[in-house]
């Protein structure tokens, strides 16, 4: 039976992604000045205005939030007042206050740590038990061997399309392009086979903001030639592949002037494109003590090492936390029947080879650095520049599974 799988991506100029980029740019500036800063910042962008609100705890950092916002908007490409939103003239309203002392205490000193004697605290196994999770919740990480980066094919292709649109806009190849854009890819497969070699692209949708003077026919021709054919491997395309290019027609009004944007509204774009469950927590604007972000990264790290080790073709890792506690309350591995050992055995291996306490995650992946603005568009996963994409524990896992 044929099955269809669809994922979408949005460009850095999409209003929700712009909001994510602003929030992560502010986070990065705090971490640049003070790596232990606690940050939870949300952004709203709309016609002529950006609003930044949230909670921060920092002792030495003094961030010029207004300047950081305007610099972020400039980088994305909203540089003209006639866009209805721009870096120079749009208002920037800031309402940032101190992190709740009750939350801070639960993170600073975990429930486990508070219950230990001084002698217990000095034990090596408790070195990473000081910091508690910044919230409760469940997080998922996933990897699949259907692409070289171990990501689902539909979201991988969708991100490549939006990246290509941004490239053509910035290098001047298609000067009529504007920052706001979306792409969507539907693939078709036989049954539950997750194999790129047995996959075809059924439908591609591209909606891109554009200037006043270009025709829709010109846009269609350029999207087919310079974007789709340049990105999608020919073996995935057939004479029956459907292309919907700006299917709503004219798309001159875009970005925050066309739609209000908010931090955290593209969580499926940020992760696996709907291929697996999502715990619901957004990433952007949050420092790594927030397990919504850091534990999702770590779960991807675990899943990717499982697949890279050849222990499964697909791996889903679920981890859950209680606020103020260091140790996860649960950890689950699901390989969808593709594992070379049982899922229960894999979970045991994960617990032996990975430490999912928040402080341990931060140390292992070196997360208290200004690396987050670059995550805000085109997905947080499948990109080798990020530390959670390493497969440095694959060999140890493989050997342990054979023992």
From Swiss-Prot:
Cofactors that this protein relies on: Mg(2+); K(+)
Sites where the protein binds ATP: 14, 180-182, 250-251, 259, 265-266, 282, 286
Cofactor note: Binds 2 divalent ions per subunit.
Keyword Magnesium: yes
Biological pathway: Amino-acid biosynthesis; S-adenosyl-L-methionine biosynthesis; S-adenosyl-L-methionine from L-methionine: step 1/1
Main location group: cytoplasm
One Pfam family hit: S-AdoMet_synt_M
GO terms under biological process: one-carbon metabolic process; S-adenosylmethionine biosynthetic process
Region (Flexible loop): 99-109
Binding-site residues, K(+): 42
Main EC class the enzyme belongs to: transferase
GO molecular function: ATP binding; magnesium ion binding; methionine adenosyltransferase activity
Residues given in the record as Mg(2+) binding sites: 16
Chain residues that bind L-methionine: 55, 99, 259, 290
Any one GO CC term of the record: cytoplasm
EC numbers on record: 2.5.1.6
Catalysed reactions listed for this entry: L-methionine + ATP + H2O = S-adenosyl-L-methionine + phosphate + diphosphate
UniProt entry tagged with the keyword Transferase: yes
Assembly notes: Homotetramer; dimer of dimers.
Family the UniProt entry places it in: Belongs to the AdoMet synthase family.
Function: Catalyzes the formation of S-adenosylmethionine (AdoMet) from methionine and ATP. The overall synthetic reaction is composed of two sequential steps, AdoMet formation and the subsequent tripolyphosphate hydrolysis which occurs prior to release of AdoMet from the enzyme.
Protein name: S-adenosylmethionine synthase
Organism: Deinococcus deserti (strain DSM 17065 / CIP 109153 / LMG 22923 / VCD115)
């Amino acid at each position: 039976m044929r099955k269809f799988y669809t994922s979408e991506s949005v460009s850095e100029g999409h209003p929700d992604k712009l909001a994510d980029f602003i929030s992560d740019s502010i986070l990065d500036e705090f971490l640049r000045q003070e790596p232990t800063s606690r940050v939870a910042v949300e952004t709203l962008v709309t016609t002529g205005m950006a609003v930044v609100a949230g909670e921060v705890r920092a002792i030495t950092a003094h961030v010029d939030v207004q300047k950081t916002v305007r610099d972020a908007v400039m980088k994305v490409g909203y540089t003209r007042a006639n866009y209805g939103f721009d870096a120079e003239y749009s208002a920037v309203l800031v309402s940032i206050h101190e992190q709740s002392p009750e939350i801070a205490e639960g993170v600073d000193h975990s429930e486990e740590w508070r219950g230990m004697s001084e002698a217990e605290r000095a034990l090596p196994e408790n070195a990473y038990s000081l910091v508690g999770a910044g919230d409760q919740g469940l997080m998922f990480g996933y990897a699949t061997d259907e692409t070289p980066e171990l990501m689902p094919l539909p979201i991988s292709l969708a991100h490549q399309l939006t990246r290509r649109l941004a490239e053509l806009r910035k290098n001047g190849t298609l000067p009529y392009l504007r920052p706001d854009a979306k792409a969507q890819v539907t693939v078709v497969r036989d049954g539950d086979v997750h194999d790129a070699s047995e996959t075809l692209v059924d439908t591609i949708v591209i909606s891109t903001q554009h200037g006043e003077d270009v025709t829709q026919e010109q846009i269609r021709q350029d999207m087919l030639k310079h974007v789709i054919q340049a990105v999608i491997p020919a073996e995935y395309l057939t004479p029956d592949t459907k292309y919907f290019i700006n299917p709503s027609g004219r798309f001159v009004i875009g970005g925050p002037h066309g739609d209000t944007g908010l931090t955290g509204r593209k969580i499926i774009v940020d992760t696996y494109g709907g291929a697996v469950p999502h715990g619901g927590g957004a990433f952007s604007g949050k420092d790594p003590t927030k397990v919504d972000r850091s534990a999702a990264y770590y779960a991807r790290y675990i899943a990717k090492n499982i697949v890279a080790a050849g222990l499964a073709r697909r791996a889903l890792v679920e981890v859950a936390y209680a606020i103020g506690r260091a140790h996860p309350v649960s950890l689950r591995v699901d390989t969808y029947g593709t594992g070379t050992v049982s899922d229960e055995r894999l979970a045991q291996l994960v617990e032996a080879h990975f430490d999912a306490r928040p402080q341990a995650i931060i140390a292992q992946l070196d997360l208290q650095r200004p690396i987050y603005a670059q995550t805000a568009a085109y997905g947080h996963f499948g990109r080798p520049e990020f530390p959670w994409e390493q497969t440095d524990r694959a060999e140890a896992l493989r050997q342990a599974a054979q023992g």
